[in-house]
Amino acid sequence: MIVTTTNNVEGHTIGQYLRIVSGETVAGINMFKDIGAGFRNITGGRSSAYEGEILQARETALKEMVDRALEMGAHGIVGVDVDYESLGQGGMVMVSATGTAVTFQ
């Protein structure tokens, strides 16, 4: 399946716009990772623990979106956007991926 942030796919003609599809996931960052990230923030380093959690959450949201598009017979998803939202003070992050499921001629 072709998944792109653009509104068209070079070499393909969109036959039908099916509907908006999305995938969401919530990632929780645990206390031990928070402590390590806090230390890295003080010393100016990057927190690979947080980066890994965010990467995994993004991949999960994208996979969920693709699975929903496949269920409706889509050949691709165009106009994909990935958003990140902090949920409260508890270290929770929601990642959502949205796009338009399409078929190609």
From Swiss-Prot:
Membrane-spanning ranges: none
Matches recorded under Gene3D superfamilies: Hypothetical protein apc22750. Chain B (3.30.110.70)
Source domain of life: Bacteria
Disulfide bridge map: none
InterPro entries: UPF0145_dom_sf, UPF0145_YbjQ-like
One Pfam family matching this protein: YbjQ_1
Family the entry assigns: Belongs to the UPF0145 family.
UniProt name for this protein: UPF0145 protein jk0060
